[in-house]
């Protein structure tokens, strides 16, 4: 996927099993992740549906790259 905006380098929907493992490792429930609406341009670009977990890779001036995860919610 090409560069989208605001330093975002990559946006992908992670597979359900990978999302389960991630949540288990982080000791979180899905709703405890930050949310992103399905209507958000980043979510639409990735083809995300409510209930999916997005992996977003951004440029960071201090870390080089920052990886964040978002739960896709309706809207």
Curated annotation (Swiss-Prot):
Classification via Gene3D superfamilies: RPB5-like RNA polymerase subunit (3.90.940.20)
GO CC field: cytoplasm; DNA-directed RNA polymerase complex
Compartmental location: Cytoplasm
Major subcellular location class: cytoplasm
This enzyme's EC code(s): 2.7.7.6
Catalytic activity: RNA(n) + a ribonucleoside 5'-triphosphate = RNA(n+1) + diphosphate
Family: Belongs to the archaeal Rpo5/eukaryotic RPB5 RNA polymerase subunit family.
Function text: DNA-dependent RNA polymerase (RNAP) catalyzes the transcription of DNA into RNA using the four ribonucleoside triphosphates as substrates.
HAMAP family in the record: RNApol_Rpo5_RPB5
NCBIfam families to which the protein is assigned, alphabetical: PRK09570.1 (NF007129)
Protein name: DNA-directed RNA polymerase subunit Rpo5
